[in-house]
Amino acid sequence: MVATVVTYLEMTTPAPDRPAPDLDGIRFAPLEADVATYRDLFARVGAQDWLWFSRMQMADDDLAAILNDPDVTLHTLLKDGTPEALLELDFREDGACELAFFGVTPALLGTGAGRLLMNHATRLAWQRLITRFHVHTCTLDHPGALGFYRRSGFTPIRQEVEIAPDPRLTGVLPKDAGSHVPIFP
């Protein structure tokens, strides 16, 4: 089993852009992804390092339905034509937008690309008629994630403990994924 503390955050008014670097060779773009392409990017952004596993264990048809839903938008940061970030905005709840998945690959960590991506995310979310932009993160994620979301204008609203079968033991993720989290056989 693997346990994590999940923190839920929300933003109820648009936050202003925060300073982001001008990154040569990095371009924000829509992401057109089939299930395999999406899972590859999902793994590079979150599954390998941070134990993101929900979409890795989801049935292909269920994931395809989400990816093809007109109320779900996907975006990325392209570096030399290769997707190196994942931004998934979910507008399926009336009046709200969930920042469903957000992150950059190790190739962009520490470059300021996350700030650039968040500025785009916030603008895109609030272009729609919403009153709430929300996200959740957990203690399995990058140690700077919670602080980053707070600096981006999100406010914590609650926490929960989640316990799930360890995806490294069920075969969903490789044994070397999430090396910061011990495996308890």
Give the residues covered by each predicted segment.
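Conserved beta-strand-loop-alpha-helix junction that forms the acyl-donor binding cleft
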Residues: 135-145, 162-168
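Short amphipathic alpha-helix that is part of the acyltransferase structural core
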Residues: 22-55, 175-176, 181
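A conserved beta-strand-loop-helix scaffold within acyl/acetyltransferase catalytic domains
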Residues: 54-61, 67-106
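Conserved glycine-rich acetyl-CoA-binding loop
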Residues: 105-119, 128, 140-144, 151
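Conserved GNAT acetyl-CoA-binding A-motif
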Residues: 125-137
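Acidic/histidine-enriched, glycine/proline-rich intrinsically disordered or flexible terminal extensions
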Residues: 1-4, 163-185
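Acyl-donor-binding surface of acyltransferase catalytic domains
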Residues: 1-30
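Conserved acetyl-CoA-binding loop of GNAT-fold acetyltransferases
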Residues: 126, 148-159
